[in-house]
Amino acid sequence: MLEITSSSNNKCKYVKSLSQKKSRQKYGEYTIEGIKSVSDALNSEREITALYVSDSFFENEKFKYPKDISLYKVQDDVFMKMCDTKAPQGILAVVKIEDEADFTPNTEKSYIYCDCINDPGNLGTIIRTADAAGFDGVLLSDGCVDLYSPKTVRSSMGSFFNMRVVTGVSYEKLSEYKNSGFQLIGGGLCGNTQN
């Protein structure tokens, strides 16, 4: 375990940079905060590259740290600066962004398609609701907010790690899915019906 005592530490700067979409895209990683989210990620098949814990969390919480993941103990005030939330729980993880290239939908499964969702909290809530309702995945158009936004991940309340979420699904792809046997059912806020 390494200790971080300064916000000018390169690891601290790196973690903070991942709150920005361009850094997440550049490095292919994102952060998650909080005991539940980190525990859910550890219990999933996601690749966690590092865990950061505050001094007080390390001293007071009984948390089982995996031996195969880099662990950093961070001075409390420095940890606060690394986090996206105003009242962090004292633990965060850096997670690799999954490769989506191999996604092929299954006609035996059900998916929710989101078009142009621009609020990260709403997207996280949709992911959480889809998980609770028994859907097998969530498909996102290019017009949707960044899937790996800290607020999206946080709003999903751990469902982020239970659901298959695929980005960049165009209308053309939806048409292909329909032609291959999927039934498409749509809903919207316009108040009109359409075939």
Task: Annotate the PLM regions.
Residues 1-59, 144-145:
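Boundary-proximal intrinsically disordered activation/regulatory segments immediately upstream
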Residues 2-6, 72-75, 164-173:
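Short acidic-hydrophobic, aromatic-tinged amphipathic segments that line or gate anion-handling sites
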Residues 26-29, 47-50, 68-69, 137-138, ...:
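Short active-site oxyanion
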Residues 43, 103-191:
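RNA substrate-binding interface of SAM-dependent RNA methyltransferases
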Residues 56-63, 192:
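Short, charged/polar "capping" segments at the starts of alpha-helices
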Residues 60-67, 103-106:
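Short loop/helix-cap segments at secondary-structure boundaries that form the rim of catalytic
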Residues 66-96:
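Glycine/small-residue-rich loop that forms an oxyanion/phosphate-binding "nest" at active or ligand-binding sites
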Residues 94-106, 195:
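Glycine-/acidic-rich phosphate or pyrophosphate-binding loops and their flanking alpha/beta elements
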